[in-house]
A protein has these predicted regions:
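A shared catalytic/ligand-binding motif for oxyanion handling
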Residues: 1-200
Length: 200
């Protein structure tokens, strides 16, 4: 982990340097900026890879009911040379880290997951005895009709561990707007996932 101090803004960066080599040097990786006024309540959870940062928000410091874990993730595209070369499965890594926190952990996962889920709403697994909450009563909107390999991995992740997809389910984005705009089209590949009952 590399830490960069941005004192002029009162921010500290938690950065993971990329492991991908390009022209003999590293590139990629992710960074999260934390304001100095809250750094005492934020701690970093160790991870194996270079594309996942997990921060723990201390419940006492933030006056929360439970400790909350913020996952910041980047998943290299499934067909990228890096993914092919390393046989990397980012969703297995995310699932393992969530499982290690236990079933009562409050989780918020944000990131560019390069997952296209199309109209697949199977991410919301409800047992027969489930009492409906507000999120579950809304079908998830998604303006991106395409589903790719990572889309299937993401919905499988949501069935095996608590977080559910909030894109297209919350006020402000009930239609599931596009999150990526390029010269050759638009897609929804950036996500917000949260544990059931998380107040976001």
């Amino acid at each position: 982990m590399t830490s960069i101090n941005c004192n002029f803004l009162g921010l500290n960066a938690i950065k993971l340097a990329g492991k991908k080599k390009k022209f003999g040097r590293k590139h990629g990786g992710i960074a999260v900026f934390v304001h100095e006024s809250i750094t005492k309540g934020v701690s970093k959870i160790p991870t194996k890879g270079s594309d996942l940062i997990i921060l723990k928000l201390d419940r006492m410091f933030f006056n929360l009911m439970e400790d909350t874990y913020l996952f910041f993730a980047y998943c290299s595209p499934a067909n990228s040379s890096y993914t092919q070369r390393t046989d990397n499965d980012p969703f297995s890594e995310i699932e393992e880290n969530i499982s290690n926190l236990g079933t009562n952990a409050q989780i918020l996962l944000l990131g560019d997951l390069n997952a296209r889920t199309g109209e697949d709403n199977s991410d919301l697994f409800l047992p027969d005895s489930y009492n409906t909450d507000i999120v579950a009563t809304y079908p998830r909107g998604n303006r991106d009709p395409v589903k790719n390999q990572y889309g299937g991995s993401l919905t499988s992740l949501c069935k095996s561990v608590p977080p559910r997809i909030y894109n297209g389910r919350k006020l402000g984005d009930t239609v599931g707007n596009f999150t990526c705009h390029k010269w050759n089209g638009q897609s929804a590949v950036d996500y917000c996932l949260a544990s059931p009952g998380t107040n976001i």
